[in-house]
């Protein structure tokens, strides 16, 4: 009787958790290495798997949205992240947001309960031999990062991610805010803080002159647009925030029946509804400055901060030079990478890459050929993008319809067109799963 093969998975974030889950459920043994809690990163607070260190939102759910399509694909692939997200969802209008603590706890418990997963709480300092999935994320420890750099023979690439502050609901002045989702989509899920032009001017001036926290030695000023600090956005011009997180369109104040000059939105952060985060307010301001400046927002004058915003480094590889669409390295086929390190950007994007990498690592362990997911699925399109775009100008990429093949028929309405792309993707993923991915253990 042949022995059961084993795959190493390094890192138990979103990508590593998905990789371990899928490998184990394909009948392959997993050694899952996670250095927390013995060694923490600058952004993590717990030892839980799949800890959400930025927002608690997994973004839109609708099939007309690229993030909605990706989540639908993940559900078809039996994603542990999506299972936990749906069990621990909190109100968020048309989006899917979660109670971050119970979400991570369920994923940790589910993976820990698998009989063929061995969890090893120690830091890995060099790339191990054997079939391995590296999913150490944007905050990879320095020793392993050096090993990866030496393997790839390239310089590090890094940029900033920033996390928004979290507030207590009972400290918000509810007389000054109102409950509403933009354009009244879904349930009324956001607390909205309306601003007059005069209030906005005071806030804007305070924000652009606020003192930022000192960056760590390993950080520089690169900023990825998807998680831009609010103070950096403000410095790009007075109007910039009004087209971003302070956009008032579709958020008429029920007291006046009119659209405010600006609106700051608060989104529920926990299942109990006791905590809210300030939407789009990722920041690197000093904590005292956050208290001073954000208390200028109507309704937040006396707010209690349970966690101030923080900023941390993100690291990613030049995947077009290094990886194949199976997430294998070109020079060592038994070494896979997954997660934000590959250049997919975002929670669900990272988790989805873990599904693909984990599936292919398990296939390799079982003596099967790794497979490329169809490019007309979002998972396949992302894998294709990060391995086929220009290496010299490579930047992280969120899920979006622009990286997917166009429809054969022309549909003028954008929402209808995107929905049709999504329906095609889900149909093709079903066929691919049934005809290509089925493994008889």
Swiss-Prot record:
| Keyword Ribosomal protein (UniProt) | no
- Primary location recorded for the protein, binned into one broad class: cytoplasm
Identify the Gene3D superfamilies for this entry: FAD/NAD(P)-binding domain
Q: Which Pfam families match?
A: GIDA
Q: Tell me which InterPro entries the record gives.
A: FAD/NAD-bd_sf, MnmG-rel, MnmG-rel_CS, MnmG_N, TrmFO
**Which biological processes are named by the entry's GO terms?**
tRNA methylation; tRNA wobble uridine modification
Under which main EC class is this enzyme filed? transferase
Subcellular locations according to the entry: Cytoplasm
EC assignment: 2.1.1.74
Question: What does the record give as cofactor?
Answer: FAD
NCBIfam families reported for this sequence: gid_trmFO, PRK05335.1
Q: What is the name of this protein?
A: Methylenetetrahydrofolate--tRNA-(uracil-5-)-methyltransferase TrmFO
């Amino acid at each position: 009787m042949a022995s059961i093969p084993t795959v190493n998975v390094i890192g138990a974030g979103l990508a590593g958790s998905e990789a371990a889950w899928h490998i184990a459920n394909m009948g392959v043994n997993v050694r899952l290495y996670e250095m927390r809690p013995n060694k923490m990163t600058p952004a993590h607070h717990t030892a839980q798997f799949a800890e959400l260190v930025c927002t608690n939102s997994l973004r839109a759910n609708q099939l007309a949205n690229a993030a909605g399509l990706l989540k639908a694909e993940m559900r078809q692939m039996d994603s542990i992240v999506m299972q936990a997200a749906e069990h621990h969802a909190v109100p968020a209008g048309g989006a899917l947001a979660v109670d971050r603590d119970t979400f991570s706890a369920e994923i940790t418990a589910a993976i820990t309960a698998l009989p063929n997963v061995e969890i090893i709480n120690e830091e890995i300092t060099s790339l191990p031999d054997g079939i391995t999935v590296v999913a150490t994320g944007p905050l990879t420890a320095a020793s392993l990062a050096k090993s990866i750099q030496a393997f790839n023979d390239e310089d590090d690439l890094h940029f900033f991610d920033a996390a928004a502050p979290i507030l207590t609901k009972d400290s918000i002045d509810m007389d000054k805010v109102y409950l509403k989702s933009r354009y009244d989509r879904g349930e009324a899920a956001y607390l909205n803080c309306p601003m007059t032009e005069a209030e906005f001017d005071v806030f804007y001036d305070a924000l652009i002159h606020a003192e930022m926290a000192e960056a760590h030695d390993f950080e520089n000023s690169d900023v990825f647009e998807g998680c831009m600090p609010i103070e950096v956005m403000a410095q790009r011009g007075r109007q910039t925030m009004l087209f971003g997180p302070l956009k008032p369109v579709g958020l008429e104040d029920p007291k006046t029946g009119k659209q405010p000059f600006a609106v700051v939105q608060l989104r529920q952060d926990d299942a109990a509804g006791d905590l809210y985060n300030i939407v789009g307010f990722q920041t690197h301001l000093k904590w005292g400055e956050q208290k001073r400046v954000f208390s200028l927002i109507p309704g937040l004058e006396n707010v209690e901060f349970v966690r101030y915003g923080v900023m941390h480094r993100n690291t990613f590889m030049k995947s077009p030079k290094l990886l194949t669409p199976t997430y294998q390295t070109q020079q060592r086929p038994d070494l896979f990478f997954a997660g934000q390190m590959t250049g997919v950007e975002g929670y669900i994007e990272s988790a989805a890459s873990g599904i693909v990498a984990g599936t292919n690592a398990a296939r390799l362990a079982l003596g099967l050929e790794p497979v490329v997911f169809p490019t007309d699925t979002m998972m396949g399109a992302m894998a294709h993008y990060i391995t086929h775009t220009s290496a010299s100008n490579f930047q992280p990429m969120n899920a979006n319809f622009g990286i997917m093949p166009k429809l054969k028929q022309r549909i003028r309405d954008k929402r209808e067109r995107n929905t049709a792309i999504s329906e095609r993707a889900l149909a093709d993923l079903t066929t691919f799963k049934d005809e290509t991915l089925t493994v008889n253990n």
